[in-house]
A protein has these predicted regions:
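Rossmann-fold NAD(P)-binding glycine/threonine-rich loop
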Residues: 127-176
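Rossmann-like NAD(P)-binding element
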Residues: 80-122, 126-134
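A glycine-biased structural micro-motif
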Residues: 36, 94, 120, 156-159
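Bacterial N-terminal signal peptides
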Residues: 14-26
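Internal alpha-helical scaffold of NAD(P)-dependent oxidoreductase catalytic cores
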Residues: 153-159, 177-217, 222, 226, ...
Length: 243
């Protein structure tokens, strides 16, 4: 057998360059679970602002919105060119995915006013009904469960309950933490919407745990044993008896 000639310096550098390219591509894929999407954030308080920052870091485009969008200019400037500012109507039209992070009493009006823009879209709902803030409708939503209630308020969307069971301060401090990541419970009726939501949870720096359909969202509603608890995925599954 004829001995193989040793690689030339040029050949070695070519191989190293190829290996580096493959490694960088794999690292990029691992860093962003969801293909880059446009996310319209309706309600840019602490929750909405934190998620906007986390998703921009992961390569997604966001539109942050409020009733007074001029007040969001400094946040948008800090987030960079992947962030835009608009009204709630603008965000509803902009996003292929919608993040709803408003006081719960506003949910029915949003469903009514932006039904056309939201139709058929994946909507992540982080709202929680608090009677002291939202009035009697919150009592009814708690009795029925936030999942079925939001589904009624937001007809025609592909609804997923998400990010309602973590306080705003923990979104930035706990995202991508070392070791086992914090879990975010999800519930929805649409498997494809749940898959999209789970990918965006990972991109935000957390581990998704699918609890069930929207009727099961009450298991992580306000007042549930796991509400706002910092649990890993295995701890959350154990607490909710999810196999």
């Amino acid at each position: 057998m004829t001995p193989t000639a040793p690689w030339s310096v040029k050949g070695r550098w070519s191989a190293l360059a190829l290996a580096a390219t493959v490694l960088l591509a794999s690292m990029s894929f691992a860093a962003t679970e969801a293909a880059p999407v446009r996310i319209g954030i309706i309600g840019t308080g602490k929750i909405g602002a934190a998620l906007a920052e986390l998703w921009v870091r992961s390569g997604h485009e966001v539109m942050i919105s409020s009733r007074h969008p001029e007040g969001l200019a400094s946040l948008a400037a800090r987030l960079g060119p992947q962030a835009r500012v608009g009204t709630a109507a603008d965000a509803a039209a902009f996003g292929t995915v919608i993040m709803l992070a408003v006081p719960y009493a506003s949910t029915p009006q949003i469903g009514h006013d932006y039904a056309k823009q939201l139709a058929g879209k994946v909507v992540l709902d982080a709202g929680n009904p608090y009677p002291e803030r939202d009035g009697p409708m919150a009592d009814a939503a708690r009795a029925k469960g936030a999942g079925p209630s939001s589904k009624e308020f937001l007809p025609g969307v592909r609804l997923v309950r998400a990010f309602n069971s973590i306080i705003a301060g923990n979104l930035l401090t706990q995202a991508n933490r070392a070791g086992d990541r914090i879990a975010i419970p999800l519930a929805g009726d649409d498997p494809a919407a749940l898959k999209q939501a789970a990918a965006l949870v990972r991109d935000a720096g957390f581990d998704p745990v699918i609890v069930g359909d929207l009727s099961q969202a009450r298991r992580f509603d306000v007042g549930s044993p796991v509400y706002v608890k910092l649990l890993t995925a295995s701890e959350l599954r154990a607490a909710l008896n999810i196999k």
